[in-house]
C-alpha cells in the first residue's frame, strides 16, 4: 500500500477509495500505535462525524475497529472537527477520530485522527500507523471483557458550546451576522454560539440531510452568503466548511474577507492586547504578499510554514506562538484549541468589531491583497520540474521583474501529478503574463 495519509488525514470516495473494511483496519492500526505503552488500564477514543450520509457507515466501522482493539469508544455524535479535538483533551481520551471530508463534495469522506491531548499526528506517527496496517502478522486482539465498550456522550455539544463561550472575547450585542453552515457539522451549533455571545443571527444552509453538505454553500461557495449579507443589511457574514474547522468572512458590502485578512485583523488585535507571543504570526507559503506587507507595517513578524494547518500547528508548538493560519480560513489560536476552529474564529472576528466599533470592511482594509494568479500544470515528474535548469532560470527571471513588488511560488501537489504555479504582483496583467510564461515552461519539462 502506498502513502495513505494526506495533508489532513485519510480521504477519498466513500465506499470506493475509503471502504468500511479499510476504516476498520485503520482503526485497529491506529489503536495499536497510539495506545502502545500507555499507562491507561482501559484506553478510550472520542469519535465524531459530520452529517454526510457515508459517515454513519464509516463511524460504525471505525468504532468496531477501535473496540475490537480493546479501546472504549466515546461517541460524541455530529460535531465539528475542533469539537472532537477539544473533547479528546477534555475527556482525557487516548485518541480522537473525526469522520469527515471537510470541504469536499458529499460522495467523499475522510478519517482524521488525533493523538492524546487533541493534537494532530506528526509524520512519524502516521508512518507507524501505515506500517501497522501493512503488517503481515494479524493483530492480537482481546476477547471477553477486554473488548472495548461504546457509549454516547450526551452532553458533548454542551461541553463544546461552553468552551466557545469561554473563548469569546467581547459581547456581540448590536451586531447582525449571517452564518452559512454548509449544511455541515456546524449547523446545530454555530447559530447557537453566535447568539449566545449576543449577536443577532441569520442562519443559511443549516439544514443537513446527509446529501446536501457543501452543495453550493459553505466556505467554498460564498455567493449565497454575499447576497444574504447585503439583503439583510448584516454587519458580517461567516462561512464554515463541512466540518467547521475553517471560517471565511464577508463584510457588510458583500466583499470577501479571506483567511489572510482575518489573520491580519486578529494579529493586530492580539498585539495591541499583549497576547501575540513574540509579536509573531504563523502563516503558510500561500499567504498573500499583502499580508506580509501589512504585518511588517504593524511591527509583526511572520513565520512561514508549509501548506496545511498541521504544519502551521507544528510551527506554533515549536515556537510557542499564539496565532497562525491559512488563506483558506484555517485559523489556530493555541490558547483555546489544538486545531483550526471556524466558529471560534468567527467569534473572535466579531469580538474585534464589537470592541473597536469598526465595520468589517474598515478592519479588513488593514491588508491590501495583491493580485494573485494560480495555474495548475499537469506534469509527468514533479521532481524533474523542481530540478530543471530552464524552470529555475525562468523563476529567477520572473523574480527580477517583480523585485519587491511581488513573488513567485512553484509548489508540487501532494496528491496529484500537478505543479502549482503562483505569481503575485502589484498589477494583475503582469501577474497573469508571468504565470502563463512559467506554466508553459513547467509544462514542457
UniProtKB/Swiss-Prot annotation:
One of its GO terms (cellular component) is cytosol. One of its GO terms (molecular function) is phosphoglucosamine mutase activity. Activated by phosphorylation. The active site is at residue 102. GO terms for biological process: carbohydrate metabolic process; peptidoglycan biosynthetic process; UDP-N-acetylglucosamine biosynthetic process. The modification Phosphoserine is found at residue 102. Belongs to the phosphohexose mutase family. This is Phosphoglucosamine mutase.
Amino acid at each position: 500500500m502506498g502513502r495513505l495519509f494526506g495533508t489532513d488525514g485519510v480521504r477519498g470516495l466513500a465506499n470506493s477509495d475509503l471502504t468500511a473494511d479499510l476504516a476498520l483496519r485503520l482503526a485497529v492500526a491506529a489503536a495499536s500505535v497510539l495506545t502502545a505503552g500507555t499507562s491507561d488500564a482501559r484506553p478510550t477514543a472520542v469519535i465524531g462525524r459530520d452529517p454526510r450520509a457515508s459517515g454513519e457507515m464509516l463511524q460504525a466501522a471505525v468504532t468496531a475497529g477501535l473496540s475490537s482493539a480493546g479501546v472504549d469508544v466515546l461517541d460524541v455524535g455530529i460535531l465539528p472537527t475542533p469539537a472532537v479535538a477539544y473533547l479528546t483533551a477534555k475527556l482525557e481520551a487516548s485518541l480522537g477520530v473525526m469522520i469527515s471530508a471537510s470541504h469536499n463534495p458529499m460522495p467523499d469522506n475522510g478519517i482524521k485522527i488525533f493523538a492524546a491531548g487533541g493534537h494532530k499526528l506528526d509524520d512519524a506517527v502516521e508512518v507507524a500507523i501505515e506500517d501497522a496496517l501493512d503488517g503481515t502478522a494479524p493483530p492480537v486482539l482481546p476477547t471477553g471483557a477486554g473488548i472495548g465498550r461504546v457509549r454516547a456522550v450526551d452532553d458533548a455539544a454542551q461541553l463544546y458550546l461552553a468552551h466557545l463561550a469561554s473563548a469569546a472575547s467581547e459581547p456581540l450585542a448590536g451586531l447582525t451576522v449571517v452564518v452559512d453552515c454548509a449544511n455541515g457539522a456546524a449547523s446545530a451549533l454555530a447559530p447557537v454560539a453566535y447568539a449566545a455571545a449576543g449577536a443577532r443571527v441569520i442562519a443559511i444552509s443549516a439544514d443537513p440531510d446527509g446529501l446536501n453538505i457543501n452543495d453550493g454553500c459553505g466556505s467554498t461557495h460564498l455567493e449565497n452568503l454575499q447576497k444574504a449579507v447585503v439583503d439583510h443589511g448584516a454587519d458580517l457574514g461567516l462561512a464554515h466548511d463541512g466540518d467547521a474547522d475553517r471560517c471565511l468572512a464577508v463584510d457588510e458590502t458583500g466583499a470577501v474577507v479571506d483567511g489572510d485578512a482575518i489573520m491580519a485583523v486578529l494579529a493586530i488585535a492580539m498585539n495591541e492586547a499583549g497576547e501575540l507571543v513574540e509579536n509573531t504570526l504563523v502563516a503558510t507559503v500561500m499567504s498573500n504578499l499583502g499580508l506580509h506587507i501589512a504585518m511588517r507595517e504593524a511591527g509583526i513578524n511572520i513565520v512561514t510554514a508549509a501548506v496545511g494547518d498541521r504544519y502551521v500547528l507544528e510551527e506554533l508548538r515549536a515556537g510557542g506562538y499564539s496565532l497562525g493560519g491559512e488563506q483558506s480560513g484555517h485559523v489556530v489560536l493555541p490558547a483555546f484549541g489544538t486545531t483550526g476552529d471556524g466558529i471560534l474564529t468567527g467569534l473572535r472576528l466579531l469580538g474585534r468589531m464589537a470592541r473597536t466599533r469598526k465595520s468589517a470592511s474598515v478592519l479588513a482594509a488593514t491588508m491590501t491583497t495583491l493580485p494573485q494568479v494560480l495555474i495548475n500544470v499537469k506534469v509527468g515528474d514533479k521532481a524533474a520540474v523542481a530540478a530543471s535548469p530552464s524552470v529555475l532560470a525562468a523563476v529567477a527571471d520572473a523574480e527580477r521583474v517583480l523585485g519587491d513588488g511581488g513573488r513567485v511560488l512553484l509548489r508540487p501537489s501532494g496528491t496529484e501529478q500537478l505543479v502549482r504555479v503562483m505569481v503575485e504582483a502589484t498589477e494583475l496583467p503582469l501577474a497573469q503574463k508571468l504565470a502563463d510564461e512559467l506554466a508553459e515552461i513547467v509544462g514542457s519539462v
